[in-house]
């Protein structure tokens, strides 16, 4: 499913604070280039165990790779949410594959946000995500012990 980089809509959310990243399709060109190892390591940490306010039905598969020898495709069904100043970047976890395998170069603002973002699931991460007037804020504390949960507004 294609969404232009930095658009205000993606598969799992939309709004003035949303910025889509890495929703690529073979039918549309995308920016290519090199990214730093520091950024790749930071993005990998975020995509390994991303916070998930919604579970999407079905996988987002890479349209650029042929099926593997077992007939399966490269893909994933999770998304990564990166809060930044005034915006939340939302990307499929496949964004890491696009960078490493296909040379995709995300916008510089996303790169800076990933480098600045606290680890997924930490108190600092949840506090940054709470800044947004979004439906998913109520899911920030799911799975936390009752004493650590914030009351709903």
Predicted regions and their residues:
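Alpha-helical interaction/linker modules in multidomain eukaryotic proteins
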Residues: 1-153
